[in-house]
Amino acid sequence: MADNSSDEYEDENNKEKKKTSQLTPQRGFSENDDDDDDDDSSETDSDDDDEEHGAPLEGAYDPADYEHLPVSAEVKELFQYISRYTPQLIDLDHKLKPFIPDFIPAVGDIDAFLKVPRPDGKPDNLGLLVLDEPSTKQSDPTVLSLWLTENSKQHNITQHMKVKSLEDAEKNPKAIDTWIESISELHRSKPPATVHYTRPMPDIDTLMQEWSPEFEELLGKVSLPTAEIDCSLAEYIDMICAILDIPVYKSRIQSLHLLFSLYSEFKNSQHFKALAEGKTAFTPPSNSNSQAGDAETLTFS
């Protein structure tokens, strides 16, 4: 039994040695193959580099074309920087994102189909003699005629105007409010009436100019005359017009008209409104005390 077991053990060892002897050359062959692959890849990379650097682009910079230039050494050194420069390759990522725009409903005007021709073929002169408006909000014919008369400035032409009347006006206050609002809008849009003076009068812009510093300094010490002064109305008008450089003639109507026109311009001016609001918003106590002191000195003097 012992001899048989020893023989079997030797046979197994011989088989393992044969296997190792067969595997060793294959391993050497595989290592050589890896080296060959590395050599091939390095050769292909070098070939690619040679192709990139060896084949110059059309119109590229060639240093040999500029060697014969009669320039100084400093300029030649500058030419060397051209070949040293390597541009940076930046890959820009273009991302296309599909999007759906927001849905915006567009509702058109309601068409009342008033442009349909008449069955008898006669022209209805729509838009020429009759105003073409949507049927949802029609204009009042009386108010429209007043607007046209005001814009055309033909007030003396006698024409037939429709007079609007309301039945049971107490039960329809909305129509009355609409009429009042439309007439008020008509009056607000009217331009100011142009008045031609028979006597020479200064312009409004001239009267709105600033006073001289001496006169403003005097107004800071002496206040303007108020209506409580002991004088007649005619004398008070002459006094105020003289302060504002408005000429006064025998009839003071034109002078008063110019005075009130000047007051209206100052009242509606945005510049002077801002100044008035700024003065009312900020009133330093020092100025008030100084003015009070000036008033007291004037009073006691």
Curated annotation (Swiss-Prot):
Cellular compartment(s): Cytoplasm, Cytoskeleton, Cilium basal body; Cell projection, Cilium
Record PTM Phosphothreonine, positions in chain: T283
GO cellular component, one term: intraciliary transport particle B
Biased composition (Polar residues): 283-301
Record-linked Pfam families: IFT46_B_C (PF12317)
GO terms of biological process kind: cilium assembly; intraciliary transport
Residues covered by region (Disordered): 1-63, 280-301
Entry function: Forms part of a complex involved in intraflagellar transport (IFT), the bi-directional movement of particles required for the assembly, maintenance and functioning of primary cilia. May play a role in chondrocyte maturation and skeletogenesis.
Protein name listed in UniProt: Intraflagellar transport protein 46 homolog
Taxonomy of the source species: Eukaryota, Metazoa, Chordata, Craniata, Vertebrata
